[in-house]
């Protein structure tokens, strides 16, 4: 028999959460409801509230119920991409093994075990790199991109 073709959905929680945190960081003096944040992320307010709840539990963000003024709980240069990843994904690995291979096939049963060590190495390296990237680094890069875009528009 053949395995059915499945469309694998990848998680965008990390990039969506970084988006939320950058919005909060650069709009500290403005009102930011979950609806306005959701509009920017192009998702629904319920999803934004779920992400924000995870950020609060991880002590990366604070907010008061009924007030649309969320804030970072510490400076952006003290929040790493790994902190954000762990807040929204927990211990979920970046790469996943296919556990639905044919157990009667020598390759099917052994390829996953062969990959596991490599996946663990990749996870470790990715987490080490993520721990060196701060939210402030991302904000700075965002502002650089905006500056370049504005300069290009002025040339045209």
Where are these regions (language model features)?
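C-terminal regulatory/oligomerization modules of transcriptional regulators
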Residues: 1-5, 99, 103-156
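Short helix-capping/hinge SLiMs at alpha-helix to coil transitions
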Residues: 25-29, 74-75
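Conserved segment of winged-helix/HTH DNA-binding domains
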Residues: 76-101
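Beta-hairpin "wing" of winged helix-turn-helix
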Residues: 58-73
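A short alpha-helical element within helix-turn-helix/winged-helix DNA-binding domains
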Residues: 35-41
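Basic amphipathic alpha-helical segments that dock to polyanions
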Residues: 52-56
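Short alpha-helical segments that sit at the start of domains
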Residues: 2-20
């Amino acid at each position: 028999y053949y395995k059915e073709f499945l469309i694998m959905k990848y998680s965008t929680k990390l990039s969506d959460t970084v988006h939320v945190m950058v919005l909060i960081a650069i709009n500290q003096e403005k009102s930011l409801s979950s609806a306005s944040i959701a509009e920017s992320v192009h998702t629904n307010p319920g999803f934004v509230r779920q992400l924000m709840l995870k950020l609060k539990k991880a002590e990366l963000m604070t907010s008061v119920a009924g007030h649309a003024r969320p804030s970072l709980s510490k400076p952006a240069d003290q929040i790493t991409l790994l902190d954000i990843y762990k807040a929204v994904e927990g211990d979920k690995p970046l790469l996943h093994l296919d556990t639905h291979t044919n157990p009667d096939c020598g390759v099917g049963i052994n390829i996953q075990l062969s990959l596991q060590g490599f996946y663990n190495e990749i996870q470790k390296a990715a987490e080490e790199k993520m721990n060196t990237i701060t939210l402030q680094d991302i904000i700075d890069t965002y502002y650089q991109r905006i500056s370049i875009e504005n300069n290009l528009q002025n040339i045209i």
